[in-house]
Swiss-Prot record:
Cross-referenced InterPro entries: Asp_de-COase-like_dom_sf, CT_Nitrate-R-NapA-like, MoPterin_dinucl-bd_dom, Mopterin_OxRdtase, Mopterin_OxRdtase_4Fe-4S_dom, MopterinOxRdtase_cofactor_BS, Periplasm_NO3_reductase_lsu, Prok_molybdopt-oxidoreductase
GO cellular component: membrane; nitrate reductase complex; periplasmic space
Function text: Catalytic subunit of the periplasmic nitrate reductase complex NapAB. Receives electrons from NapB and catalyzes the reduction of nitrate to nitrite.
Family: Belongs to the prokaryotic molybdopterin-containing oxidoreductase family. NasA/NapA/NarB subfamily.
Residue sites binding [4Fe-4S] cluster per the record: C48, C51, C55, C83
Entry protein name: Periplasmic nitrate reductase
Cofactor(s) needed: [4Fe-4S] cluster; Mo-bis(molybdopterin guanine dinucleotide)
UniProt PTM: Predicted to be exported by the Tat system. The position of the signal peptide cleavage has not been experimentally proven.
E.C. number: 1.9.6.1
Subcellular location: Periplasm
Residue span(s) of domain 4Fe-4S Mo/W bis-MGD-type: 41-97
Signal peptide start and end residues: 1-31
Length: 831
């Protein structure tokens, strides 16, 4: 028998997944008695619930319950493969502690901040919630209301949220947990190209000659895409892989150029590579002259800490951290000329030979390069700079917007791209890259939404970390969290978030499927439907929009986040939320409910129930009397059509395994900005970065600046946080899957064995991890998948019994406001 390399890789992937979950694999599976048909399982397509890869899965339903899933052979993304988490999707909805009814803190029969959680009806839950929101609106106005959403929201849910908050409550205090993972990437796209999202796609994996991973452990965090990297590398001897990280991990095992650098010095390495390209005469001057302009970024931009923090006061000299000034190629070359091989090697701790080999991957005009990055770059106090500096390398060499030449920002959540970014649930955004600060774009949104001009406020709201601080300070008093475990995920959560949640002036609502750390800190818990318990749509990292039908009912009284927002809107009239001057100028809106204004507005409600799939239920549509999801999608789509964000008609998505936008004349776009590949590029332009008015991309000159909190004599160890293969984010789903729990039941403090020996710790010893903000206990791990350099420890954050974010620093990139979870100083002490 012969076996192809691809089949071998598939078998290896299945074996790794099985071993991770302690599942024995038989050499030959037994036949099903009576054949597969006898199982009477109905199969339907859906995208995976977990990361932003967007794998297609087939979901098996029997007797109203999801009983099995498997990789979708027709899905281009994963071609039938799943990672170990994907194999257990059928179990994520059936944890023993699934929430099935609203829970309100009560004492003596009434709501009390210090009361016990008590089951209540949806009517009482919403009545209490509405009364609290109206109290805050009356006493402090709309800026005291906030909502924290998610890159796991469906496109419909995110769109409903941005309408409810901006057009309904007139508050821009809406932000997603994607602030913690993708904000730096989004800002860098906008600052460089004038449009968000990657220009390439997953097809680049089969065309590239080199893969450079910047702060990305793809083998564990994007394992299905990693199989495509491995297939390309192992099947083509000329292909090279470089992996840059602050410690050695599973992705490093495939690396031809394994690089471990000192935390924060990736900025210097990036400037060294740019200098190498210039000094060796490999700049593509024709491309640079025709398609780019140069700018210099503001420096001394601080660390996004509170204004009175001494570190912030010492580091911040720039008035506007996001400011840029026109520059030239010569000025750029002068700045990067300081980053010599010897200087950067000493600063970063990387061997000169590895740095030279890395630089040559980019400099070689005959080698196509795919750069890949995720949290190591984005969770960085200079994350926007880091993203833009990678674009510098691709723009200097012209290696961009064509098969195999691709700077590619990987995404961590299922719809961080499709919902958080494209729908516009960040504090400053509207759909399709529009912003609330632009009066023309606000007016565009108001016309599409059929609301009066002037309703949408122009001031950006509070970002994620600022929301925690405002809750703590008592200036944000009504707060609704959906589809995320924010308290476990927040940096410095003991110092900022926890006191804010329990501030007696604040009312906290959490919509979730399980009693998470965040839910248990709330005042009201609303039970939420999950994944295929609702009709949904996600947008993945390659701009692919994928839609699925509702396949099963949610348990008990659980309801989707979309239903919750729409139903909540029925409890408010415009008189209660809009100012008198708007109502006086538009008297026909006076007295209308927010539901009528936002959802039963002649646009969202224009598709009746006859358009529903007769086989699959749609809870929201049946509740409100019209096809809710189709109406929301078709109202949202015009934001992007004709503007480079074109979506296909909604019904089309039910027939395909996703389409990559822009979808023009029924055809998806794989590579953007290149003539012949992108319909928006004008004939004769060759390459056109049409997001910017001049059609050119920006190359930015910025220096290396050090992290906010380096180790010192007392706190002498770098702490890095992150994830592991078996668990996803805070573990609220995966820790309830028995096989995944057994595979990795608790977080560990990964440590260099020599550091452990010097400190007197044996393998498995319990230790205290202490920072200036807080401490936790964990156990030392000196073996296994993560091999730490001296002076660095790694702790994953999935374990609710080890809240490592008690320890982390709430520093953010001052441009993107994204949190740096990768660099703070700790000490390791015995228990």
């Amino acid at each position: 028998m012969t076996i192809s390399r691809r089949d071998l890789l598939k078998a290896q992937a299945a074996g790794i997944a099985a071993m991770a979950a302690n599942i024995p694999l038989s050499s030959q599976a037994p036949a099903v008695p009576g054949g597969v048909e006898s199982l009477q399982i109905t199969w339907s397509k859906a995208p995976c619930r977990f990361c932003g890869t967007g794998c297609g899965v087939m979901v098996g339903v029997k007797e109203g319950r999801v009983v099995a899933t498997h990789g979708d052979l027709l899905a281009e993304v994963n071609r039938g493969l799943n990672c170990v988490k994907g194999y257990f999707l059928s179990k994520i909805m059936y944890g023993a502690d699934r929430l099935t009814q609203p829970l309100l803190r009560k004492k003596d029969g009434v709501y009390a901040k210090d009361g016990e959680f008590t089951p209540v009806s949806w009517e009482e839950a919403f009545d209490t919630m509405a009364a609290q929101a109206k109290r805050v609106l009356r006493d402090k106005g709309p800026t005291a209301l906030g909502m924290f959403g998610s890159g796991q929201w469906t496109i419909f849910e995110g769109y409903a949220a941005t309408k409810l908050m901006r057009a309904g409550f007139r508050s821009n205090n809406l932000d997603p947990n994607a602030r913690h993972c993708m904000a730096s990437a989004a800002y860098a796209f906008m600052r460089t190209f004038g449009m968000d999202e990657p220009m390439g796609c997953y097809d680049d994996f089969e065309a590239a000659d080199a893969f450079v991973l910047w702060g990305s452990n793809m083998a564990e965090m994007h394992p299905i895409l990693w199989t495509r990297v491995a297939d390309r590398r192992l099947g083509h001897p000329h292909v090279k892989v470089a992996v840059l990280s602050t410690f050695t991990h599973r992705s490093s095992d495939l690396a031809d150029i394994p690089i471990v650098f000192k935390p924060g010095t990736d900025l210097a390495i990036l400037n060294y590579i740019a200098n190498h390209i210039i000094q060796t005469g490999r700049v593509n001057r024709d491309f640079v002259d025709r398609h780019t302009t140069f700018v210099a970024g503001a420096t001394g931009i601080g660390y996004g800490l509170r204004d009175d923090d001494p570190r912030e006061m010492a580091a911040r000299t720039a008035e506007d951290p996001a400011a840029t000034t026109p520059s030239t190629f010569e000025e750029f070359a002068e700045l990067v000329s300081e980053y010599t091989l010897d200087k950067v090697s000493e600063l970063s701790g990387v061997e000169p030979a590895f740095l030279e080999q890395l630089a040559e991957l980019y400099a070689d005009p005959d080698r196509k390069v795919m750069s890949l990055w995720t949290m190591g770059f984005n969770q960085h106090v200079r994350g926007v700079w880091a993203n833009q500096m990678v674009y510098n390398l691709h723009l200097l060499t012209g290696k961009i917007s064509e098969p195999g030449n691709s700077p590619f920002s990987l995404t961590g959540q299922a719809s961080a791209c499709g919902t958080a970014r494209q729908v516009g649930t960040f504090r400053h955004r509207l759909p399709s890259d529009m912003t609330v600060t632009n009066p023309e774009r606000r007016q565009d949104a108001e016309e599409i939404w059929r609301i009066p001009h002037g309703v949408i406020p122009e001031q950006p709201g509070l970002h994620a970390v600022a929301q925690d601080r405002a809750l703590h300070d008592g200036t944000l008093n009504f707060y609704w969290i959906q589809v995320n475990n924010n308290l476990q995920a927040s940096p410095n959560n003991d110092g900022e978030a926890w006191p804010g949640y329990r501030n007696p002036d604040n009312f906290i609502v959490v919509s979730d499927a399980y009693p998470t750390v965040t839910a248990l800190a709330a005042d009201l818990i609303l039970p939420a439907a999950m994944w295929v318990e609702k009709e949904g749509a996600y947008g993945n990292a390659e701009r692919r929009t994928h839609v699925w039908h509702q396949l099963v009912e949610a348990p008990g009284e659980a309801r989707s986040d979309l239903w919750q927002m729409m139903e909540f809107s029925t409890r408010f009239t415009t008189d209660e939320v809009w100012p008198e001057e708007i109502l006086a100028a538009n008297p026909n809106y006076r007295g209308q409910s927010l539901f009528d204004v936002l959802f039963r507005n002649g646009s969202v409600d224009r598709f009746d129930l006859s358009e529903l799939n007769p086989v699959t239920p749609t809870a929201e549509s049946n509740a409100f009397g019209f096809y809710v999801q189709k109406g929301l999608f078709e109202e949202y789509a015009p934001f992007g059509r004709g503007h480079g964000h074109d979506l296909a008609p909604y019904d089309t998505y039910h027939e395909v395994r996703g389409l990559r936008w822009p979808v023009v004349d029924g055809k998806e776009t794989l590579w953007r900005y290149r003539e012949g590949l992108d319909p928006y590029v004008e004939p004769g332009a060759g390459v056109q970065f049409y997001g910017n008015p001049d059609g050119k991309a920006r190359i930015i000159a910025v220096p290396y600046e050090p992290p906010a909190e380096p180790p010192d004599e007392e706190y002498n160890i770098w702490l890095v946080t992150g994830r592991v293969l078996e668990h996803w984010h805070s573990g609220s789903m995966t820790m309830r899957v028995p096989e995944l729990y057994r595979a990795f039941p608790g977080a560990r403090c990964f440590m260099n064995p020599e550091d452990a020996r010097d400190m007197g710790f044996n393998q498995g010893a319990e230790v205290r991890i202490v920072s200036r903000r807080g401490e936790i206990r964990s156990r030392v791990e000196t073996r296994g998948r993560n091999r730490m350099p001296r002076g660095v420890v790694f702790v994953p954050w999935f374990d609710a019994s080890q809240l490592i974010n008690k320890v982390t620093l709430d520093a953010t990139d001052p441009i993107s406001k994204q949190t740096d979870f990768k660099k703070c100083a700790v000490k390791i002490l015995p228990v």
